[in-house]
């Protein structure tokens, strides 16, 4: 009986929650957003426009990196960037 109550409580706590992820946001062509000049303000705004918690310019790759993106928002995969292909 205790396991059943625990299971019900666990289901109620997770119902309706949307997962969040971190990563490089992309358009449909798998191209990430460049941030020349290490513009953290640009990346933070871009990420927040995509409903992320925050973002910054990752200087090693010169790309915007977001924290807390919604699961439905596409992020960079291991494939190559294909400009113009949506």
UniProtKB/Swiss-Prot annotation:
Membrane-spanning parts: none
Pfam families xref list: Toxin_3
Chain positions found as Proline amide: 83
Keyword set includes Disulfide bond: yes
PROSITE patterns documented for this protein: LCN_CSAB (PS51863)
Coiled-coil residue spans: none
Domain notes: Has the structural arrangement of an alpha-helix connected to antiparallel beta-sheets by disulfide bonds (CS-alpha/beta).
GO annotations of cellular component type: extracellular region
Disulfides per UniProt: 31-81, 35-57, 43-64, 47-66
Protein name: Putative sodium channel toxin Ts17
General function of this protein: Alpha toxins bind voltage-independently at site-3 of sodium channels (Nav) and inhibit the inactivation of the activated channels, thereby blocking neuronal transmission.
């Amino acid at each position: 009986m205790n396991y059943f109550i625990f299971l019900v409580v666990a289901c109620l706590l997770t119902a309706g929650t949307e997962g969040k992820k971190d990563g490089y946001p992309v358009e449909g062509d798998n191209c990430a957003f460049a941030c020349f000049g290490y513009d953290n303000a640009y990346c933070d705004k871009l990420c927040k426009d995509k409903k992320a918690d925050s973002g910054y310019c990752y200087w090693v790759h010169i790309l915007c990196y977001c924290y807390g993106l919604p699961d439905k928002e596409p992020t960079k995969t291991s494939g190559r960037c294909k400009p113009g292909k949506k």
